A protein has these predicted regions:
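Flexible metal-binding regulatory segments at protein termini and peripheral loops
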Residues: 1-31, 38, 101, 110, ...
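Conserved catalytic phosphorylation-site environment of P-type ATPases
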Residues: 68, 168, 268, 278-354, ...
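P-type ATPase nucleotide-binding
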Residues: 334, 338-460, 469, 481-497
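Bilayer-spanning, highly hydrophobic alpha-helical transmembrane segments
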Residues: 12-16, 227-257, 272-290, 571-600
Length: 622
């Protein structure tokens, strides 16, 4: 609890004790009434002040105004105990709401407790000095001792250790790191001493981007939140005017009919109507539900950029995957080399050198298989041809390395290969030199992930890939993916997603899942863009609506289940709050419901709705 909450709790306790004493002990009226007024002012003075300021600033219609009018009116009718009770229970509800929101924020802060407080930097004498991470420049060597957080992204230059990435990924399995491995901020060093050369400033590091993402998520409102905001703006003035009509019209009608006006009875009913009508339960619990849902998701390594995306994900019926790095490991290995008119080693050397400037996983596998240091001085005029391959001049000869489309582009006859895998054809000075077969492994949970998506209510799964049809069909068959589209260029993937979007129902959403490396256009075109394996990937965090911090495809169904649970809670609160209020408003208007029922309809409903909203935090076992 903060100071404000503690102070309010003391006021509530004092007011409650005094209220109970006054109700239990039979006191003369001339003592009882002043005591009730003292308790009323002690617990409600701030509400009265807020209502007065609202009137002065011409922002009349809010819950403070409703409570002030209702309780002052009750005092005017000499219902001192009910006026005090309404104000007391309203303040109890407000305190509980404040505490619940604060508690959920604290939980989320603890779950996302990844911000490092300091970085260790060696001074000129070799002594460690703790400095603010913001002060550390790129290229600085920082020292991370066991038990400390990695402060800034970088590369290990000395030492080996295991890192706990649970706060980022939701997974407890530690990650082994040693010299030349990349590490990201927010991880906890568990065993050995590490010296890390920073590759980013703190403001651009992974931990900063994640914290910004989580903190700014509340600024992107869902349709449900926007509806509640609009509803409250119309609803509050409407019930105020309805209460005024309830107070004036029946007595006037009675007078016209020659009956007693009975203004006191109708004023009491109008005041009861006002207390019941307070929209706190909706205004508070709906944003809290989304806030808790986003916080619970972040604990599981699912970062949602706004409640609008969480709401959209709950209506997701189609999931489209990129193959490489999403359903497969993206760790390619050379499975075979078929040479034509040059030695096998020379074919691999030419292919590796031509691809040496590319960051594509296939290029990395060729470099790994080649195993030697690349002499970049031998390579000239490198040109990457999107969706086809690479053209380069190596040792004065022109080398083409890529798929069959590249061979067709340059009218080079090539040998068909029926091996399962990605085929890299190589041509030297316009003559076919052979091809290299590269295979990719499925991710361990890929098949389970597709099954889990079907159980989560996904109608259709689709896989898009630039790979050849034989490889794509084999992967889709193994994983039981419904549809597969192969041999696609990057622009073809965007067109295919647009085609799929045009075929779906307007109330159904389509999610695209990619590894965030080359998928930015498709991620932004889908209803929901999901980047997975984003640990350390700036591009993924920027491009996607939802970011999965590790490589486990099972997290996709987890994210959908979290979204559905959150939206289910939101609608529970909407139906419950509106339903109870409508019934009580009707009972209040006809005189059956009194102030005590009104207190339940306001404070009781709010507390129940807030408690229900907090359930959205609990997503671990989904």
């Amino acid at each position: 609890m903060n100071k404000k909450q503690k102070k309010m709790l003391k006021r509530i306790i004092v007011a409650s004790i005094l209220f109970i004493i006054i109700k239990v002990v039979k006191l003369p009226e001339y003592i009882e009434i002043p005591l009730f007024l003292v308790v009323y002012l002690e617990i409600g003075y701030d509400i009265l002040l807020k209502a007065f300021k609202g009137i002065r600033n011409r922002q009349v219609f809010d819950e403070n105004f409703l409570m002030a009018v209702a309780t002052v009116g009750a005092i005017g009718l000499k219902s001192f105990d009910e006026a005090t009770a309404v104000m007391l229970f309203y303040q109890i509800g407000e305190w509980f709401q404040s505490y619940a929101v604060g508690k959920s924020r604290k939980n989320i802060t603890e779950l996302m407790d990844i911000r490092p407080d300091y970085a260790n930097v060696e001074d000129e004498d070799g002594n460690l000095e703790q400095v603010d991470p913001d002060e550390v420049e790129i290229g600085t060597i920082i020292v991370v001792k066991p038990g400390e957080k990695v402060a800034i992204d970088g590369i290990v230059v000395e030492g080996s250790s295991t890192l706990n990435t649970a706060a980022l990924t939701g997974e407890s399995l530690p990650r082994e790191v040693s010299e030349n491995d990349e590490v990201i901020s927010g991880c906890i060093n568990m065993t050995g001493l590490l010296k890390i050369k920073t590759t980013k400033e703190f403001g651009e590091s992974t931990v900063s981007k994640i914290l910004d993402l989580v903190e700014n998520a509340s600024s992107k409102k869902s349709r449900s939140e926007a509806f509640i905001s609009r509803f409250a703006r119309i609803y509050t003035p409407a019930v105020c005017y309805s209460a005024l009509a309830l107070f004036l019209l029946p007595p006037v009608f009675n007078l016209i009919m020659g009956n007693p006006a009975d203004f006191g009875t109708w004023l009491y009913r109008a005041l009861t109507f006002l207390v019941i009508s307070c929209p706190c339960a909706l205004v508070i619990s709906i944003p809290l539900s989304f806030f808790a849902g986003i916080g619970g998701a972040s604990n599981q390594g699912v970062l949602v950029k706004g409640s609008n995306y969480l709401e959209a994900l709950a209506s997701c019926k189609y999931v489209v995957f990129d193959k490489t790095g999403t359903m497969t490991q993206g760790v390619f290995e050379v499975a075979g080399i078929h040479h034509a008119n040059i030695p096998e080693e020379k074919l691999l050397e030419y292919a590796a050198m031509a691809e040496s400037y590319s960051t594509h996983p296939i290029s990395k596998s060729l470099l790994k298989a080649y195993g030697n240091t690349i002499d970049k001085s031998r390579i000239e005029n490198v040109e990457e041809i999107s969706g086809h391959g690479v053209k380069a001049v190596i040792d004065g000869v022109q080398v083409l390395a890529g798929n069959d489309k590249l061979m067709k582009m340059y009218n080079i006859p090539y040998q068909e290969c029926h091996s399962i895998g990605t085929i890299v054809h190589v041509a030297i000075d316009g003559k076919y030199a052979g091809h290299i077969v590269i295979s990719d492994m499925l991710k361990p949970h890929a098949k389970e992930a597709i099954e889990a998506l079907k159980k989560a209510g996904i109608k259709q799964t689709v896989m898009l890939t630039g790979d050849v049809k034989s490889v794509a069909d084999k992967v889709a068959s193994e994983l039981h993916i419904d549809k597969v589209y192969s041999e696609l260029l990057p622009q073809d993937k965007v067109n295919k997603v647009e085609e799929l979007l045009s075929l779906k129902h307007s109330k159904e959403n389509l999610a695209f899942v990619g590894d965030g490396i080359n998928d930015a256009p498709v991620l932004s075109r889908a209803d929901i863009g999901i980047a997975m394996g984003a640990l350390g990937s700036d591009a993924a965090i920027e491009a996607a609506d939802i970011v999965l911090m590790d490589d486990d495809p099972l997290k996709i169904s987890k994210a959908i289940k979290i979204a559905k649970k959150c939206i289910h809670i939101v609608y529970e609160n909407i139906y419950f709050a509106i339903g109870v209020k409508l019934i009580c408003l009707l009972l209040g208007a006809i005189g059956i419901a009194n102030m005590w029922v009104a207190i339940f309809a306001d404070v009781g409903v709010m507390i129940i709705a807030v408690l229900n909203a907090i359930r959205a935090l609990n997503v671990k076992n989904l």
